[in-house]
């Protein structure tokens, strides 16, 4: 039986909120089978638990934001992406601010944190959402689509007309049947443009943003002194984001995802459209491990590798 997973022990880290610029303490705790991934604002009295679900995503302008009863947890996509990449089904995420810390702008720190805690199987079957017919969302020239596929693969195209981005490639495809999340996706950093950062700071946002946690571009070049971690790091980060955005559906997807200029909002709209059509998906488990898609086999996890 392909089993659910959680972490073995509590693990904690401290980082900076991308928009607030304030110190954030993040604590990850094991959770029982069937719990899902639950975020808790422990700084509130009483504390507010917000399960990671597609319907709980509210604001998507700058990040994926979970909301409940006036409480918010922002920028959850990188941690959710790491959980998807490591096959974590159940986890308590305690945070003492309204943002998950940005760390280095990728999912690598969260992968390290989860692996440091240890990953263990639980006595319940891992549940998957298998897409059974195409689901598509369009918004102008933007597209996000899910198709039936016995595995998990993603294809993403961006369109940023900038010299530094143009020369790195604007399309990337990955199939986790034969590719490692930790090697090929987890280290891709978020990116932004210097003039946009200044505009955000003028309205009290991006106070924690720096060259230490993002790739920053001016009109002509990359301002960071270090090299890109991947030749096409920009589009790979969009795939990292998409994996995290899609994981709030509640279970790993057995599907092919295709996107053109998609973002957090369109990705969430795609999940809502999927869940609204009961004929578009089914919940499945695998009693025999060898019958599961290769991307999710034990030898490819934790970390799809």
Curated annotation (Swiss-Prot):
Q: Give the record's pathway.
A: Glycolipid biosynthesis; lipid IV(A) biosynthesis; lipid IV(A) from (3R)-3-hydroxytetradecanoyl-[acyl-carrier-protein] and UDP-N-acetyl-alpha-D-glucosamine: step 2/6
Identify the residues that bind Zn(2+).
78, 237, 241
Q: Does the keyword Zinc-finger apply?
A: no
Which EC class is the enzyme in? hydrolase
Any one Gene Ontology MF annotation carried by this entry is: UDP-3-O-acyl-N-acetylglucosamine deacetylase activity
Question: What positions constitute the catalytic site?
Answer: 264
Among the record's GO biological process terms, what is one? lipid A biosynthetic process
Q: Which cofactor does it need?
A: Zn(2+)
Q: Which residues cross the membrane?
A: none
Q: Which UniProt keywords apply?
A: Hydrolase, Lipid A biosynthesis, Lipid biosynthesis, Lipid metabolism, Metal-binding, Zinc
User: Organism's domain of life?
Assistant: Bacteria
What would be one Pfam family of this protein? LpxC
EC number(s) recorded for this UniProt protein: 3.5.1.108
Q: Which reaction does it catalyse?
A: a UDP-3-O-[(3R)-3-hydroxyacyl]-N-acetyl-alpha-D-glucosamine + H2O = a UDP-3-O-[(3R)-3-hydroxyacyl]-alpha-D-glucosamine + acetate
Q: Spell out the GO cellular component terms annotated for this protein, sorted alphabetically and separated by semicolons.
A: membrane
Tell me the function of this protein.
Catalyzes the hydrolysis of UDP-3-O-myristoyl-N-acetylglucosamine to form UDP-3-O-myristoylglucosamine and acetate, the committed step in lipid A biosynthesis.
Entry's family note: Belongs to the LpxC family.
PANTHER family linked: UDP-3-O-ACYL-N-ACETYLGLUCOSAMINE DEACETYLASE 1, MITOCHONDRIAL-RELATED
What is the protein name stated in its UniProt record? UDP-3-O-acyl-N-acetylglucosamine deacetylase
> From which organism does this entry originate?
Ralstonia pickettii (strain 12J)
Gene encoding the protein: lpxC
